Regions:
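Generic alpha-helical segment signature
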Residues: 47-54, 223-226, 386
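Extended, small/polar residue-biased N-terminal targeting/export presequences
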Residues: 62-128, 175-177, 181-205
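Conserved P-loop NTPase
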Residues: 338-342, 349-377
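Terminal targeting/pro-maturation regions of precursor/exported proteins
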Residues: 2-91
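Cleft-lining beta-strand/loop regions that shape enzyme active-site pockets
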Residues: 126-129, 137-143, 151-157, 161-344, ...
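Conserved functional hotspot residues or short segments at active or partner-binding sites
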Residues: 86, 364, 383-384, 388-399
Length: 399
């Protein structure tokens, strides 16, 4: 096989605009495939018949179509998506360069940027809020500043957040010039800011106020840094007096498979974290890694419909190994495995190749994990700031 395997990942289901998007699957990233070798593997008879047919259609459309034609890249991307659509697999997909870059940054847990959060106001303007001790704050950017342009490109209400983010982010140590409006009436200010590595924390933790010996750990995704952050959380909570733990995996759409194995291993003494079934029935097991920091503390895990992929791996491993009960709602149910090929224009191709199972060999695709204690959190409770699932977790640890 001429591809070089770079690493194995579990899918990241991104949460955008309040719904689950992306590919909650196991991923294997592979280096850029060589076009000449791919062509060499094509059936010559197929190539001689079908590829001219594609160009025949293209030529007719280009000559006779009455409307405005998209650019060639858009047409090519559409043709690729059309071909993949015939596979009837929603997780075999083509990912455009910008989205692929964002996924990789999220999985690394860091990116080159200026350290601002962004949101739109009711008029569609992009409002900035600099992070503490960030390049943007040191340069003079203030909360509420309206982003007008980046490197001379106007930022209007029609420019997508993905496009704005791509303009602001860039290589560490490179510089970017932004222009903002401030005040009423607005005055214009320009800042040239040197980008630095901005961390994307995936873990938050605290002692539960009602039960100060209960530690609460929430994990938003599985990135390169997650296992280290979990270790830090466990260590600090134990030092503060925590003797019981709540592990919150709600709305965690997944991430790196290896991070999932490492995180689960912090709570397990031994055993298997997951099994993977490949093409032809080949099975691979992933065992618990030694050195866990919380292998004997009482533990419960919070899950909901947004718990997917690597988060389901971890939740299933903790339950199947008799380590924790699951509290909340049924999980998303994604267990497919993909190869991800980096393509020549920085886009990527995701191809489903296998699926994974829990330690008791439960399949998750299409069914997910049913909680041991079902607690539904209503929108009214969420809006009122009441977390009945967390309340149930605290109660379960007290029994």
């Amino acid at each position: 096989m001429y591809h070089k395997i770079r690493g194995t990942l579990c899918g990241l289901a991104l949460v955008l605009a309040g719904y689950l998007v992306g590919l909650a699957t196991a991923w294997i990233i592979i280096s850029q495939p060589r076009v000449d070798l791919i062509a060499a593997h094509l059936d010559p008879a197929y190539a001689s018949r079908q590829i001219p047919l594609l160009w025949e259609v293209w030529d007719i459309v280009e000559t006779d179509f009455i409307g405005e034609l998209p650019d060639s890249r858009t047409m090519t991307y559409g043709a690729i998506r059309g071909a993949l659509g015939t596979l009837n697999d929603p997780y075999t997909a083509f990912i455009e360069p910008r989205q692929h870059q964002r996924q990789m940054e999220d999985l690394r847990g860091s990116f080159g940027g200026i350290g601002v959060t962004m949101r739109r106001d009711k008029d569609g303007h992009v409002l900035l809020s600099p992070m503490p001790d960030s390049p943007a704050r040191r340069a003079g950017v203030q909360s509420g500043d309206i982003l007008v342009s980046v490197e001379g490109q106007p930022i209007t209400p029609t420019v997508s957040f993905d496009d704005v983010t791509a303009l602001v982010r860039g290589p560490v140590s490179s510089s970017v010039t932004i222009q903002i409006w401030r005040g009423d009436p607005p005055t214009t200010h320009s800042f040239t800011i040197v980008r630095q590595e901005i961390m994307l924390p995936s873990v938050t933790w605290r002692l539960v106020e009602e039960q100060p010996d209960v530690g609460y750990i929430a994990l938003s995704r599985f990135s390169d840094r997650s296992a280290g952050e979990i270790k830090q959380a466990i260590g600090e909570l134990q030092a503060a007096g925590a003797t019981r733990l709540i592990f919150d995996l709600r709305d965690n759409g997944g991430g790196l498979r290896q991070a999932g194995v490492e995180v689960a291993s912090q709570f397990l003494q031994d055993g298997v974290v997951m099994y993977q079934w490949g093409k032809g029935g080949v099975e691979e097991s992933f065992g618990v890694m030694s050195g866990g920091l919380a292998t004997d503390l009482p533990l419960v895990v919070l899950v909901n419909h947004g718990t997917a992929s690597a988060a389901e791996i971890v939740a299933g491993a903790l339950r199947d190994n008799g380590r924790a009960r699951l509290i909340g709602e049924p999980t998303f149910g994604k267990g497919s495995v993909q190869h991800i090929y980096d393509l020549s224009d920085s886009s990527s191709l995701h191809v489903t190749t296998a699926e994974w199972l829990t330690p008791k060999r439960s399949r998750l695709s299409g069914q997910g994990l049913a909680p041991d204690i079902t607690v539904v959190r209503t929108p009214e409770e969420a809006n009122a700031g009441r977390d009945v699932q967390l309340e149930a977790a605290i109660e379960a640890l007290s029994k």
